[in-house]
Amino acid sequence: MRIEYLADRPEALPPLARWKHKEWGHFRPGDTVEKRQARLADTSNRDRIPLTVVALEGEEVLGSASLIEHDMETRMELTPWLAGVYVGEAFRRRGIGAELVRRIMSEAGKLKVPLLYLYTVHSERFYAALGWTFLERTSYLEQDVVIMTDKP
């Protein structure tokens, strides 16, 4: 397994957009796979935020994670964010998600980010095991979420 920049693997856009739309499309009523793909394409950078990295095995796309400026419209003062960590269902429980998170942390460190944020509905224990710290529990998009922080 290797992790590359989405900027270098544009062919990963369609499967990633489909997966992420299926997983999180309900958060944006009226959204489409095409709109999600366009937003994801906007993260095709290597040396600035926003950026996305892609996990691959051979040419097969396994998952991705992003470093973005804002991920919660209600908490615009918090920036930047680890976002969109997703591993395809067939590839889970192999440590790929953890490697994607570590890579984003490394990218944030290169960009001199002092503190990184994330929010999660179900994965607080996963991120805590990677060293992330609880910041607060709140409601966002009609769901209870936990905001966490970590220093790159």
Give the residues covered by each predicted segment:
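A short beta-loop-alpha structural element at the N-terminal edge
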Residues: 2-16
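Hydrophobic alpha-helical core bundles mediating ligand binding, dimerization, or RNAP-core interactions
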Residues: 16-24
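Active-site rim helix/loop that mediates acceptor-substrate recognition in acyltransferases
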Residues: 25-54, 62
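Conserved beta-strand in the GNAT
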Residues: 52-54, 60-70, 81, 86
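Helix-adjacent hinge/juxtasegments
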Residues: 68-79, 94
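Conserved acetyl-CoA pyrophosphate-binding loop and the N-cap/start of the following alpha-helix
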Residues: 91, 95-103
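Conserved GNAT acetyl-CoA-binding A-motif
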Residues: 108-120
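C-terminal "cap" of GNAT-fold acetyltransferases
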Residues: 118-123, 133-152
